[in-house]
Structures are given as C-alpha cells and as structure tokens.
Amino acid sequence: MVDFPSRFDVIVIGGGHAGTEAALASARMGVKTLLLTHNVETLGHMSCNPAIGGIGKSHLVKEIDALGGAMALATDKSGIQFRVLNNRKGPAVRATRAQADRAIYKAVVREILENQPNLWIFQQSCDDLIVEQDQVKGVVTQMGLRFFAESVVLTTGTFLGGLIHIGLQNHSGGRAGDPPSIALAHRMRELPLRVGRLKTGTPPRIDGRSVDFSVMTEQPGDTPIPVMSFMGNAEMHPRQVSCWITHTNARTHEIIASNLDRSPMYSGVIEGVGPRYCPSIEDKIHRFADKESHQVFIEPEGLNTHELYPNGISTSLPFDVQLELVRSIRGMENAHIVRPGYAIEYDYFDPRDLKYSLETKVIGGLFFAGQINGTTGYEEAGAQGLLAGTNAALRAQGRDSWCPRRDEAYIGVLVDDLITLGTQEPYRMFTSRAEYRLILREDNADLRLTEKGRELGLIDDQRWAAFCAKRDGIEREEQRLKSTWVRPNTEQGQAIVDKFGTPLSHEYSLLNLLARPEIDYAGLIEATGGEAIDPQVAEQVEIRTKYAGYIDRQQDEIARLRASEDTRLPVDIDYTTISGLSKEIQGKLSQTRPQTLGQASRIPGVTPAAISLLLIHLKKRGAGRELEQSA
C-alpha cells in the first residue's frame, strides 16, 4: 500500500453524470476535491441515448443549472436538436428535450472539469473503502494507492457487479467496452446495507448510410430553437438536424415472440428488474400484445458520425435475432448494425438506508448518488450527484446538510421519494410525481434555487449577476404593468380592442389585462407601445400573472402543511411504545426511521390517524421534558 502525498476533503468515485456534478459542486464550494475515474477518456460519457431532458427530466436539468451545475450548458453547447414537449399544455408540464452530439457533450464536460479550481482528476479504479469506527476515511485504488478524505461520494452507475447479456451469453462489464467494479462490489456487500439487482438495456446502433430515410417521417426541431441553460443562448448550439420516426410491425413482433426463449429476461437468466418506463422491445411485445406497432425514433448520435440510435427497440436478444428484427422495420431493410444491443445487470443499494443529504445512515461521510440508489437516467443521476457533492463539501466544512423540500424542487421530490418509499425498479422522474408542479416549473428553477445556491457557495459571480438582473427585471416590469392604466375610448384602449377583440368597460391596469386568457404579453406590449425586454423576464411576468390565483392557492396549501411537514422525529424514538399504532405501522416506521413527520406521512400504509398519534406523542414527550427541566 502507498499513501497519496496529499489529503482531500471530498473524493468522488466515478466520472459519469452523477460523479461529474458531484465533483464540480464540491469544488465550486471551495473544498479540495478528487475525482477518481477508471478512464479519463469517458468522463461525461452518454452511455445510453444521446439526449438530455424530457418530461420531468428537464426540470431536474434546469435545477442543476440553477445551482451552478454543468449539464444544461453542456447540452446547449452540444445539442443538435431542441424541442419543447407539451408545448400546448400549461407551463407546469412543459419540458425541453435536446438531442446531443455525444462527442461534443463529452468534450465540453471534460473541459469544464479540467478548468474547475479545487478539482483534481486521477485515473484509477477504486477497489476498497477505508472505514474506521463506522466512518469513511478514504479509498484504495486498484494498484494499492490510498487516498484519504473527510467524505466519499460513490457514483458507480452500472459498474458494481456489472453483467452484460446478449442472448443467453453473458460476461462481466460496466458497460460495453468497460470493465466492471468487482472488488468494490464485494466490499460494498460487506457493509450493513440492503442490496439488490436492477437491469437496464440499450438498442443496437445502426449505420445511417444503410437506412432509407425517404420512407420515414421527419421530425425537425423547434423554431425558434429553445435553450436549456439559464446562462445559455441559441448561438451556442451546433448545426441542427432532424430525427426520424418509423414503426415496428406484425413481422417484427412475430420475430421477437418466436425467440423469447432465447431472451435472457424471459428465460430466467436475468434476475434484475428493468425500468418500467423504458421497456425493452421484448417487454413491449409481451406486455402490449394487442398493439400492432410501436414507434421507433431514429436519433443521430452526432454531426460527425453515421451512427444512429433507434430509440424504442432496446433489446438483449441474440445478435441474429437483433439483425432480423431491425431489418423487418420500414426504412431499415438493409440496415447494418454497428454495435449490438444488450442488457446489463448491476448492484444497487436500498435508498431507504440514506439520509436526505444522500449520506448513508450507517457509515458517516459515505454518500451515494445515481444508479447506485436505484434511479435511471442522466438527469436523475446529475441531480443526485450535485446534492451529494454539495453535502459532502458541507460536511467537510463542518456545516449543516441541505436538501430542498418537495415544494421547493424536483430534486426534493426525487430524494424524498427514494429515501421514504425506496424503489424495487429503476426510478424515473415525471411531473406527475410532484404535487406542487405549478410552482416547480422548469422556467422558474433559478428563481427557486439560485439564491440558495449562492448561500451554499455553488454560484459564481457571473451567474449571480445574471440572476439578480433577471429577478430585478421581473419586479420592475410587474410594477410597470401594475401602475400603467388604460381607459376605454383612448388610443391605447382601441388598440387593445383591435388586437384582441376585448372591449374595455372601464379603466384597467396592464397587469389586470394580462391576466385575461385571451391576452398574451407580446401582443399587449405591441398594442400599448411598450419596450421589448429580456424574453426570460417576459415569460416569467406572463406566467406569474396568468396563474397568480392558482399559485397563491398552492402556496397557501404549502404553508398549512409545512408546520407538520418539518416537525422533526427524534432519532431515538421507540415506535413500539406509542399506544394506538398498529403493529404493521410500528414495523414500517421502525424500519424506515423517517426524519420528519412529513416523511412519515408518505410511507405506504401509514395513515393520517397514525400521524395524529405521532403528533400527540411528540407533544407529550416535549411537555414531559419541560416538566423534568423545571423540576
């Protein structure tokens, strides 16, 4: 064993989406951070589909961005197609999605990492953790080099005990072309943590020169081109390209159905549970047997490659079956497969063994982020990485941990779901998981989180100045609209009637008019001769005005719930002594050990009546302690 000559405050294991955000967050906060990766060339690598964002996911990306993270800016600099999903629905569920050039995205992330002060990168696999008296002290690499730190963040992705399946054949691997973490997986299984197996998969990659796009439906990006980062702009984007849509058919389904006995999932070879919302094509055919076809989105992997990602046909069937099913799809009759699809099984740890900070309950200073916690997706991983890296740095600084509440961020929803409910399948974020989604929009992530990020030390001066200018601009414009009045039978009044067909019965402020559903901000400014302002400011003014009543109602609901939500439950509370609680509920509470009353209320099977009994118990306990102190 050899000790590295320098000591670190935080060590991050893994250079994927969770690891990069964790390392960057920790370093931005001013603590000495080491990023340990098995291969420097794969930092920020997109292991699965070449896309960032989507329903629920873009909210996480914008929150990462609002806290100074890299994912959104890397997407703006590498995005080759941008679209806003649910554009005809309300702002709460609108979501930005971008196709990214894999090579550019990875290069941008690496550049950000290499230029981040307080961050050191070292290429070596981690084989062991140094743990003394239930506290992590450092790590040991493959060559026996020891690094010491106050906190360690594990972001191992699919590498822990990774097993790759193609047909009935399998081999060890972290992903295609990369070795797994076997020694570390064995070490982790020695810790007093609940462990399970999950699986995910990827489709075969296709050579675009062998595809007939003329029989497919073109899917261009949006115009004007959306932007992902609050600090981004459309000028950052590379050349934009289209995606294409085709479909499976009866012949495709017949090929798959007749070969299910050769599928590792349906022959019992794979034990891990796959993602419900990103099923393999075998799963789709089996679960939705009544459907005659399934969409396949043909996504370009980049501007300087012919490789295509056929989103929708993830598979682990044998190669000969993969080739046959691909060539049964319209437009891909002569397709050449560049890389076969595969499934991968890996270890994950029950997130109910974590605190809100993502620190493990049993090993002090050991944090988990990403797929190790049972999630799926780049965005979910990046969000956890940022939070874990932040809390690892806070711990090194001797400061209190932080996690946003469910009413403050989708990051808060994600973490609360994981540590309260756990997961038996890969967890994916959706807007439907958030009860306060009208407040947790992707467009206002900076207004919700950037001020807190500045307080934590995550936000640099440039981003802070831009945020303050936007926040002040919103306040100024709302005040201007509130104090500007329009009367009937005036030039401005008539302009509004002509523009919107809305007669004015009496004097209105521009803010009152903007609240009307038929009046939009751009048209109102055009009719009344106002000056053009920052589009981000204009968007916020319009949304806040039109949804003011609903937003106020949701804020009132949050205020009512927050009192009990934040009530702390003592660490040493013995649920078996609380009269009135059923044995089942006592067991659930004893196993989960919720930190707050709000968290306890979200445990499946814990009734409102049980929460009332807990509240009564806490009041009695508090009163009893006051009597003891007075005596």
Swiss-Prot record:
InterPro entries registered for this protein in UniProt: FAD/NAD-bd_sf, GIDA_C_N, MnmG, MnmG-rel, MnmG-rel_CS, MnmG_C, MnmG_C_subdom, MnmG_C_subdom_sf
SUPFAM superfamilies tied to this protein: FAD/NAD(P)-binding domain
GO terms (BP aspect): tRNA methylation; tRNA wobble uridine modification
Gene3D superfamilies membership: FAD/NAD(P)-binding domain, GidA associated domain, C-terminal subdomain, tRNA uridine 5-carboxymethylaminomethyl modification enzyme MnmG/GidA
GO-annotated cellular components: cytosol
Binding site for FAD: G14, G15, G16, H17, A18, G19
Cellular compartments annotated: Cytoplasm
Entry binding sites for NAD(+): 274-288
One GO MF term attached to the UniProt entry: flavin adenine dinucleotide binding
Alphabetical list of PROSITE patterns matching this protein: GIDA_1, GIDA_2
UniProt cofactor(s): FAD
Alphabetical keyword list: Cytoplasm, FAD, Flavoprotein, NAD, tRNA processing
Stated family: Belongs to the MnmG family.
Subunit structure: Homodimer. Heterotetramer of two MnmE and two MnmG subunits.
Function: NAD-binding protein involved in the addition of a carboxymethylaminomethyl (cmnm) group at the wobble position (U34) of certain tRNAs, forming tRNA-cmnm(5)s(2)U34.
Protein name listed in UniProt: tRNA uridine 5-carboxymethylaminomethyl modification enzyme MnmG
The organism of origin for this protein: Pseudomonas putida (strain ATCC 47054 / DSM 6125 / CFBP 8728 / NCIMB 11950 / KT2440)
Name of encoding gene: mnmG
